[in-house]
Regions:
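Small-molecule-sensing regulatory modules
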Residues: 16, 21, 25-202
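Short loop->beta-strand "edge-of-pocket" segments that line small-molecule binding or catalytic clefts
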Residues: 2-16
Length: 202
């Protein structure tokens, strides 16, 4: 929409804070104003609210959409088809983690079991990613420094690349202090000299 005002649906203070600064720099037209409106409900409900009303955009976690459309269970087939069909009606932008880090631990699933259930624990261990556990723990440790809480304007992402773990951190404290960090957390020795910047910084 070639308009100077955008009306965007989002329920996340973190996303609202980041997008207020991100969108004016990266959209191909000048923005005079961005209005954010709160939205509730599951993913299909949110998408339908967006399509059925006069809004310019909606912000949704890519991890949530990926899980729904890639679900192989028969009972989710129609839902997956519906979401794909609605996505095709829209133009989509996947914002870079360097500018819009995720909520700490976003996309990770936690499973609580009894210690004595060895069979179940063994099966869970076989599908557990140790690097993901490390990244989630690092993200949560940083969030604790800010007091924690999902209503804060704080994004923290750690993810693995051929150069090592990348650390992206951005947001605003409860005292109104802005912060931003983008770094290689721990370096790996790169054997292939032809490794591209896209691999190091996806």
């Amino acid at each position: 929409k070639n308009s100077k005002t955008l009306n965007i649906l989002s329920s996340s203070p973190r996303r609202i804070y980041n997008l207020q600064n991100f969108l004016p720099k990266y959209l191909p037209f000048k923005l005079d104003n961005i209005n954010f409106q709160n939205i509730r409900g599951n993913i299909p409900t949110r998408i339908n609210k967006f399509l059925d009303n006069d809004f310019d955009a909606i912000v949704i976690a890519k991890a949530a959409i990926d899980r729904l459309i890639n679900n192989s269970f028969e009972e989710y087939r129609n839902l997956s088809f519906e979401i794909k069909k609605n996505i095709e009606k829209c133009l989509w932008m996947v914002t870079p983690l360097s500018e819009n880090p995720t909520s700490p631990g976003q996309g990770a699933l936690g499973i609580e079991t009894k210690k004595e259930n060895n069979d179940l624990n063994s099966k869970i261990a076989s599908i557990t990613s140790q690097i993901d556990i490390k990244c989630v723990n690092l993200e949560r440790d940083i969030l604790k420094n800010y007091g924690g809480g999902c209503h804060q304007k704080i994004g923290v992402s750690f993810f693995e690349t051929s150069a090592g773990l990348i650390h992206s951190e951005k947001g605003q404290t409860e005292d109104g202090v802005n912060f931003s960090e983008w770094e290689i957390y721990n370096h790996k020795k790169i054997k292939d000299k032809k490794v591209s910047n896209d691999i190091i910084f996806p």
